[in-house]
């Protein structure tokens, strides 16, 4: 019963809506807040008096504002949106805290009479609440109960249409932005793009690949294949990288399983050409690995990740605590960490062949643009310290993924055309690299925050890096006459220019303060380090190869052709003199020695060593935060010490009258550690959510007398430790 004296101010800016009573309010007086639009961005629809709310312990706390949809993003604007007060230190200049790019929208649910329903296509009835699940694992709840009916129809229909329905490639905001934005950024930023012949020649020289390898221009104008890059290295298959001992990492696509006579003859001629090449030094020692027979399929990877991400798409704190008691069981059932473990193990096996056996490795996959990219990239990160620098890692992504022809457009399903092609292959690589980063932090110039924002950039359609299936597709869509701009030739931005998204202060979070550059050897030593057949230099653990093995492919050519033209190539073609447990011996031997952070790195893959990438997957869940804890506690202390060292260095330089220059490596001020938590730098200390003494799931188990140990664990009250 409401008191007759109860009054609600017309100037109210926020309301509290509870599940136990309904509060009737008049439309609040709103300040005019307009969205900040990028070049080429157009406002499509908007709705006023929308409440963005957070569900907690059965109650809703919300903020009143405006919900808008543009051809680039969905944005919620409140009075604080136009204010620069309390601006976070780590701020993205393109995507704000309450912004969702259209490509980042995963699923949209409407709430009808407290029941959720997936929204797709045309709507007959419009919901009173809207829940948006994002691919970066954010969850947005909007209440439309106090919004005008016509505005509800426009905003809901607009959001669903522009974020969930199939579209043409040229309709992406990528093209609108590129045609309207000024071309005044430095896209290369020390990153090798591998779009010129010189880039490939320089990479051959850097890795000291065999002198018989050659960068070619055969595919200029895409005369040979639209799938291949304009330039690549031959003679055998596609060259990826050369080890210091001369062994090479190669890749090729698999032959189709079903063939006619003409196709079979063509493939036999191709294999004869391979035989003539690999029967001579330095290719006669070659091991083939068909990744389709040793790693999960793309469908298995997609299924595992779909299950995995559901653990982090939390609607409210009640759901969080109800699943907390069985979280590890749910995690194991997704199989996501097991897939990461298998990929790391496979990369270690390949590294063992290159490093210990001095053997060339040929990776084979249906298209050679998915798991081949994952394994070849991981091997280079593990074996080449240059790939562990920021510019080196970015160059690696350009070489193996962007120029290598990974179908980002299809695998990320940016156009919403086919869910069958969707698979988080690139995200799988970042998860594997993160395992190495958290196991060996001093070995990497970049941080886990760098990997996190790189994963977020998959869904920011102002960069061309992750929005094409091949270099040919990109070149085709940039060469049209209709794409000329007034300021000059049409050019896309690359994600590697981090100044577009972050200012210098924020970019400091991408750089690892613990990293030390590899000391450069003397030129005299560098000249004597190159040998004609470096592959023949053996490590102490490397067994001596008998001369009879050099005729392996000549003796087994017919058998090799049958294998390739058959269903599948088997796993590694193992040498008879190779011990069966050579991988485990190599793995255990390496881990028993001190780590050289500029040398070979092998991931720890046993037991609980493979972990959840907490920063990426838990950063939006306040209940999972550690106040003043997590890796940020260590990083904050290190950065404070570095700041003090830098200030002392400034004083010393001033005494010697030397100019002090600033740059992106400037250390951010983080003195106020009381506001830090494990969510930092993506969020400061958020609301506390105390674990209930009796979790919801326990009530259901009270009548069951079994499993007393588990029940006792559920009754543990940790709330006193969180205060």
List PLM regions with ranges:
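Conserved N-terminal structural segment that caps and organizes enzyme catalytic cores in eukaryotes
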Residues: 27-31, 35, 43, 54, ...
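A positional/structural detector of protein chain ends, strongest at the extreme C-terminus
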Residues: 1-3, 12, 719-723
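N-terminal cofactor/phosphate-binding cores enriched in small/glycine residues
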Residues: 78, 105, 109
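Disordered, polybasic Ser/Thr-rich segments at the N-terminal boundary of pleckstrin homology
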Residues: 11-54
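A phosphate-binding catalytic loop at a beta-strand-loop-alpha-helix junction
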Residues: 250, 354, 359-381, 433
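Short, surface-exposed charged micro-motifs
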Residues: 64-66
